[in-house]
Amino acid sequence: MPESQAKPGGNATSAIMLLALASFAAQAMVRVTDSLLPQIAADLNVTVGATSVIVTFYLLAHGSVQLVIGPIGDRFGKYLCVAIAAASAAVMVALCGLAPSLPLLVAARLGSGFATGWIIPFAFAFIGDVIPYERRQQVLGRFLSGQILGQLFGQAAGGVLGDWFGWRNVFFILAAALATATLGLIYELWRNPITHAGHASAQPGRGFIADYSTVLRSSWARTVIVISFIESSVMFGAFTYVGADLHLRFGVGFTLVGLFVGSFAIGGLIYSLSVRVLVNRFGQTGIATGGGALLALAYVTLACEPSYWIAPAAILTIGLGFYMLHNTLQTNATQMTPEARGTAVAIFSSALYLGQTAGVAAGGVIFDRFTAVPLFLAAAAVLLALGLWFARAIKRRHAQMA
C-alpha cells in the first residue's frame, strides 16, 4: 500500500521506545485505581462507592479528549504533542499522590485523564508517519508490549505496591515514569529529525472541520471505525464480567480471580513477541480471521467450562486472539487517511473507549438478568463474524489499492 510521503531520516527505534515508556504509564493510569480503591477510601475516610468516581471521571476525560485532539497533532506534530502531554500528565499524576481530599483527587484524576488521553493515539499516528506500511504491524505489535505491561502493572502491581508502600507512592512511581519519558522525548525532539515527521509544514493548510471531514468521507475509515467500536463493545462487554462469573459460578476467591484475569495480558505479550512470525506467515487477513476464531473458541470455553481451572488458558487465549484482531485494526487505522493521520487515529481511539463504555453498560444488564453465559456465547458469535468481516474488507481494500 503506498505511502503519502517519503519517510524522514533519523532513528525511529529510540523515538518509539520512549513513546512505549509514556504509553506504559498512560495505560497503567487507566486501571491502577481498580485495586487501590479500598486503600484510598480508607485513607480519605469515604466509602468505596464514593471513591469510584475517580475511575469514572478519569475514563470520561481520557476518552472524550480524543474526539477533539486529532487535528492538533496533525498541525503541530504528534511527537511534540506527546512530549507536552507526558509533561502535563507527570504533574497531574503527582498531584494525585498529593491530594488531601476526594474532591482534589477527582480533579487531579480528571486532569491526568485529559493529559494521558493524548499519548497513545499520537504514538500510533507517529509510528504511522515514520514506519512503512509493510513493516508497520510488526512495529506496532512490539510497541504494544509497553501498553500491555502498563495494563498488567495497573491491574496487579498497583495493588501490590499499594499494600507495600501506600497508594500515594503508586502515583508517584507513575509520575516518575512520565517525567523520565518527558525528558527523553524532549531530547529526541532536539536531536532526532524523525520526530518532526508528519508536521503540518509539509502539508497543505486545512481547518479542524476539514480534517474530520477528510476522515469521515473515507468509506474505508468508516469501516475500520465501526468495526473497532463493535469489537470493543462486544469484547469488553463480555470480558469485564469474567471475574464475577468465576466468583459466582465456581466460588473462586478474589485473589485467584485477579491472577486468572491477569493471564489476558500474558496472551497479549505472546502476540507482541510473535507478531513478526505471524505477519510473515499469515498476513493481515489470516491474523484477523485467526484472532476472531481464537476469541470465539475461548468465550465458548468460558461459557461451557465444567471447572474453573480451565479459565486461565481460556483467558490467555482471549488475550492472544484480541490483540491479533485489534492490532490488525490499529495498523489499518494508521493508514485510513494518511493526510490527516492524527485525526484518524484519535477518532479510532475514541471509538474504542465509547464502545467499551457502551458494552460494559449493556453487559451489566444482561449479566444481572441472565448470568454471563449468554454474554460469552454472544461475544463468541459476534467476534468470529467480525474477524471474518474485517479479513474480507482488507482483501477488498488491497484489491482496490493494487
Task: Label every PLM stretch briefly.
Residues P2-G10, W190-I225:
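Juxtamembrane intracellular "pre-TM" segments in multi-pass secondary transporters
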Residues A108-L149:
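Cytoplasmic helix-loop-helix junction between adjacent transmembrane helices
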Residues L104, Y133, R142-W190:
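Helix-loop-helix hairpin linking two adjacent transmembrane segments in secondary transporters
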Residues V65-G77, I270-G283, F367-D368:
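Helix-to-loop junctions at the C-terminal end of transmembrane segments
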Residues T285-L329:
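C-terminal transmembrane helical hairpin of 12-TM major facilitator-type secondary transporters
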Residues N45, G77, L98-L104, A115, ...:
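Helix-breaking motifs and short loop linkers at transmembrane-helix boundaries and internal kinks
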Residues M92, P103-G111, W309-T317:
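Paired small-residue
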Residues S64-P100:
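Conserved MFS/SLC helix-loop-helix module at the cytosolic interface between two early adjacent transmembrane helices
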